Curated annotation (Swiss-Prot):
Binding-site positions, ATP: D47, I48, S49, G50, F51, T52, D99, K144, V406, N412, I413, A414, A415, R416
Annotated protein name in UniProt: Adenylate cyclase type 10
Record-linked SUPFAM superfamilies: Nucleotide cyclase, P-loop containing nucleoside triphosphate hydrolases
Residue stretches making up the Guanylate cyclase domain: 42-179, 293-418
GO cellular component: cilium; cytoskeleton; extracellular region; nucleus; perinuclear region of cytoplasm; plasma membrane
EC class: lyase
InterPro entries recorded: A/G_cyclase (IPR001054), Adenylate_cyclase_typ10 (IPR016577), Nucleotide_cyclase (IPR029787), P-loop_NTPase (IPR027417)
GO molecular function annotations of the record: adenylate cyclase activity; ATP binding; bicarbonate binding; magnesium ion binding
Cofactor binding remark: Binds 2 magnesium ions per subunit. Is also active with manganese (in vitro).
Sequence similarity: Belongs to the adenylyl cyclase class-4/guanylyl cyclase family.
Keyword RNA-binding among record annotations: no
Bilayer topology: Peripheral membrane protein
Amino acid sequence: MNTRKEELQDRAIVRIAAHLPDLIVYGDFSPQRPSVDYFDGVLMFVDISGFTAMTEKFSTAMYMDRGAEQLVEILNYYISAIVEKVLIFGGDILKFAGDALLALWKVERKQLKNIITVVIKCSLEIHGLFGTQESEEGLDIRVKIGLAAGHISMLVFGDETRNHFLVIGQAVDDVRLAQNMARMNDVILSPNCWQLCDRSMIEIERIPDQRAVKVNFLKPPPSFNFDEFFNKCMTFMDYYPSGDHKNLLRLACMLESDPDLELSLQKYVMESILKQIDDKQLRGYLSELRPVTIVFVNLMFQDQNKAEVIGSAIQDACVHISSVLKVFRGQINKVFMFDKGCSFLCVFGFPGEKAPDEVTHALESAVDIFDFCSQVHKIHTVSIGVASGIVFCGIVGHTVRHEYTVIGQKVNIAARMMMYYPGIVTCDSVTYNGSNLPPYFFKELPKKLMKGVGDSGPVYQCLGLNEKVMFGMAYLTCNRNEGYPLLGRDKEIKYFMCTMKEFLMSNCSRVLMYEGLSGFGKSRILMEIEYLAQGENHRTIAIALTKVSFHQNFYTIQILMANVLGLDTCKHYKERQTNLQNKVKTLLDEKFHCLLNDIFHVQFPISREISKMSTFRKQKQLEALFMKILEQTVKEERIIFIIDEAQFVDYASWIFMEKLIRTVPIFIIMSLSPFTEIPCAAASAIMKNRNTTYVTLGAVQPNDIRNKVCLDLNVSSIPKELDLYLVEGSCGIPFYCEELVKNLDHHRVLVFQQMETEEKTKVTWNNLFKNFIKPTEEFKMSGLGNEEGTEEICKLASGVRLKNLSPPASLKEISLVQLDSMSLSHQMLVRCAAIIGLTFTTELLFEILPCWNMKMMIKALATLVESNIFDCFRDGKDLRLALKQNAASFEVHNRSLSLQPTEGIAHGEEEELRELESEVIECHIIRFCKPMMQKTAYELWLKDQKKAMHLKCARFLEENAHRCDHCRSGDFIPYHHFTVDIRLNTLDMDTIKKMATSHGFETEEEIKISRAGIPKNSELFSENLSPEEIGERILGFFDVILTKMKTSKEDIIPLESCQCEEILEIVILPLAQHFLALGENNKALYYFLEITSAYLTLGDNYMAYMYLNEGERLLKTLKKEKSWSQTFESATFYSLKGQVCFNMGQMVLAKKMLRKALKLLNRIFPYNLISLFLHTHMEKNRHFHYVTQQAQESSPPGKKRLAHLYQQTACFSLLWQIYSLNYFFHHKYYGHLAAMMELNTALETQNDFQIIKAYLDYAMYHHLAGYQGVWFKYEVKAMEQIFNLPLKGEGIEIVAYVAGKLSYIKLMMGYLDLAIELGARAHKMWALLQNPNQHYVVLCRLSKSLFLKNRYKHLIQMLRRLWDLSVAEGHIISKAFFYLVCLDIMLYSGFVYRTFEECLEFIIQNEDNRILKFQSGLLLGLYSSIAIWYGRLQEWDNFYVFSNRAKTLVSRRTPTILYYDGVSRYMEGQVLQLQKQIEEQSETAQDSGVELLKSLESLVAQNTTGPVFYPRLYHLMAYICILMGDGQNCDLFLNTALKLSEIQGNVLEKCWLNMSKEWWYSNCTLTEDQWLHTILSLPAWEKIVSGKVNIHDVQKNKFLMRVNILDNPF
């Protein structure tokens, strides 16, 4: 039975009937319109307060999760309760109007007395519902009820597509008046109702000076049985459910199918509702908080109450209103009698109906409706209120009776303006500002205090939309601000400068057209051009058109000529007339002067000839006259005519301009939005003219967006997070950027404060990334920054999550216009894509699209790519490349395009779409062009639908949420998924096998791979070989492996390179967000930790930090649920925090985090010396145990144990490096213990890779500490371990890793020849293994070794490879290192590979790159090198700029070769500064010298500074000594440096040392600009290769450090 009932209730007719009252559903009406029906009844008007305030609260909410749906739930919770009461008591809900409803009890007149009692009982029970409740949102919901009874008329009216009905009569007026009198929780009876009711049953209270009364309560006699009374009353109600249907709320729920009835009922329902009823996919689609424009029309009549009298007037008005709205996609939402009149609530921008220029169209419609209705007989006053903004549009009510309605402050404002400003068209300030119409179309009205809307801002009267020629008012709309430059538009201005030059030098016309969408800053460009175009021999005329200009014949030329003739400054028509007479007397006979009357608003007497002339002839005469005037004018001065919004140029003006540019030399500059329809022939001819330059505007680049934000906010820097949000969200469109900033400011997200000095702030995790992005250099040089000392910075308010912010209403509107212009199926695709995220794969989209086939999807995607909704990319690399730059402006060659045959064009379009389809098939990554579209489309979903879609996405993505096949599909955090149960899908055996092998469990087959030709370790290290021989054998082993890799037929080498970065971006990042949306916090945390680990692998410390913060938020919420897995997650969390701090050079913080992680992993690291020695003793025993037991096979640890061990190894590996950085003697014991604990933990894992890494780390620790015997032993152990590995997959990677790591150790220790040999082999291996992340590291180190050996040929080869790799992979660190070596070559090798300017440009462009900025060492080296360059040139201002930037990075100490390389350069810069101080005989020179010497000595004394840096450091120490007159120590340091260079084979330093030695002790003096002469003569590498320059001569191009011992003041 229930199923049958559900089926019935799901019928289309039942769903339509739910939108209509029984009065219509069961009505019997004549087909003529208007038609009138009469009856008696009781009316109840219920007004619910609190909803508008709630709608406002939701519509201005910051975050996307507070959507329409939550609002619908709250609204309908209350309204459905009221509806239910009304239906139970036999009422019929006639209308819902926003937050009010009107109900009717239709009965014969004699039944009114009893029915009024029933209605009063119903009213009191409704009040009872709200007496005690308070909404969950903390809003007080209260109701006011008015009751009336008597004669009622019903009027049905409409056109052939849509019907409306109204109830009219005294009772309708009375019920509204009664409700108006009511206060909260009152029930008021109208005078007539009080007259007709059973007074004995009702206790009332009189209202002073009123005939209406207030009901206190019902007072039935003791014997009264209400149920019996009620049942008796209901027998008089025609459609009250009884008998079999007595349990139903409404009889209409059981309507049988009836096509005729269905057809007639459909006419009463809005088209969008019918669409939703037909298409079940769209359920819930119409409930939205969305920006709309409300047009409230009120008609007052001479004879108010007679339906038959006013019916025809309402019918005429309705037909006209409908026809006007249809043109602009507006809809009549409601019609009702309202305070002495009939009101139409019209809405523009309903779901599916959003159109561009909505506000303009609404005003245009309002004026049209006003003009028409004012002429209709019997209508004596027309008042219209127009307001724009966000309102709630949605279905409100109960499942059995509801309506589509709009609720919000803007609806109230429009209604109030309509009532308080009768007889005119009014609009609010939002509509005024958004109309893009000239101000003279409006007049600001005096403010009135309007009930219920508070201060709604200024109110304007719309005076009409006929363009009046207000001379001097059509100027450009924006004003140029001297202090506000045009940012990021140099290329566009260049087009103007070139065209201007051509125009001034030639005698023919030029046209420059800038085409761009709204918001691209076209008006700003023209404003700048107007300023630049000012000159002595030419006149500039600049005008801005509006939408209305298009409909005014010859308007553009009218304004141009008024300016040329100087009429724009005339105050009065007589002044204009005199001016015109003087200008045209020689060109035009006096009797023809009256031709100018209409066009220039003058009053010359009309001659007989002109009165006989046809309009066409008059126009031709005028055009001829204007042409003569312009020909005459250009002989005296050139004319530059600038037109903004040129898409609104009228047809006649285009024709004249086309003729004009052929006849008269004139320069026309236009900006225009893309034409919506094909432009007229004249406009096309201008675009195709050979002298036209047509530029399509591109977006502004990220750097300029940042500069713009700093300028708009008047700050010196903004947070990195804000920078990323604005760059991504604005897509380089200036208007988008402004709106986003306004929105943030509105929500108080931006906090401004004085800039703190670097020293003041103590480093904590929260301020670890003092990531303030400053404007670019060029911007600062333009002198627009703040004055020194008063610099303010912008910060984000705490706890703000930018990516969850709701888009600003203005941008939402733009997206909705685009969405609503699509077909329903395309809308559905975009909305589904929005759930997946900003970037998604075609596979996942196909998975979640309901009932689509692949062909349909590809076709739809191609169309959406063509209309710039989506971009498609072949792979992650293409995507990353595209995101770095925005599309720039470009020139369109319309002339060459026009030469194609027309049928070819149509064919070309089809061909283009086909090509796009095949491109989409090839590209599997799709991304929204604009993030705002994704956010807007996402917000349209209902909560349950969202959840279901997120779940689908999560299930699909989860299968691929691991490392790529190249990296053997493991977790980014080893064995992570074994410790935490997070999967939705149950694992199949294949997946488990795959994941197990990824962590180094070889299968039998893998071990049996042929190892022929590879020596066994017994063969390698059998006898007592010398270190040199062992070295040779090791190199031989690597050569054998390389040969095997190149020639083996087995699949040793992977088929493709590492795809982990792509998997991170398109699988794991979205998956974490899906779990977050599903409220699965533990799963989201798991993936946030994976993401962090992945970003650390990719060298992106900033993103790792951001996602750790996301994880921290979740950890706090999960802390309440104590479980073991959370302990592991916490440990991993601190371990990852430690890694980020370590990479950022914040060692105190890193140590704290790593200790916390170890504590959670049950491996406490000692805090005091007693505990230290105890632990050391234990670890030594443990090590001895592992070494002796190694021969015996013991069972490997379980997976969960392995997860712990891997984390412990990572922590210990960082800890020993941190302790090695410290000078205090006891720290070396801590360092040694950490290194040993790492080794023992690795041995426990029984994993070859872990053991080998630990052996090499242990060797490295002893290398740096200077224990020769120990390090050698462990390097040999590591080698022995790799001989036993299977040469496949991970085995080969371990071999490559060992070669690279040994090469690094040898470079640090200064064994340059061995470093090069090992590095070359490692480079070849990683190249074959296609692992760019490892490959670039080896190439960088190899380049460094070759550079120190002066092996330039090989060096340049490696640099080329490094460059190719950096370009192919879009890899910033390898590119930065490339430029670092290029600077080195110029500074120390004496030739040029890439120019200094190119290197400097790279640094300026990329210093804010998030990977480079937070990578310790590289930027320090680059800044220091530039500082050295300027220091050598004695350009001290530039030196200080870069030296100070380097200084801020020195404190980020990390024990890496890059950091020490950077520090040694920084010290060199400081030494040059010291030399300047000594020369200037500065008082602080002596102290500075001593301080510098100490710093250099401590660097040499530090364990972690590799010996490879000693020669340079001793060289600098020697220079300081000679500057300070300490010859003895100078000799000592010089000789030490020379000796070390000799031992290491450091040819570069040795050569420079010898030159310094010779120079310092000679009597020669140095010219001031010696380095300038040197750099001017630096040869390019090409000259050296071609033999034009001898390589030995090049070595003399070294900087000679200036000394002047004779004048030494010390």
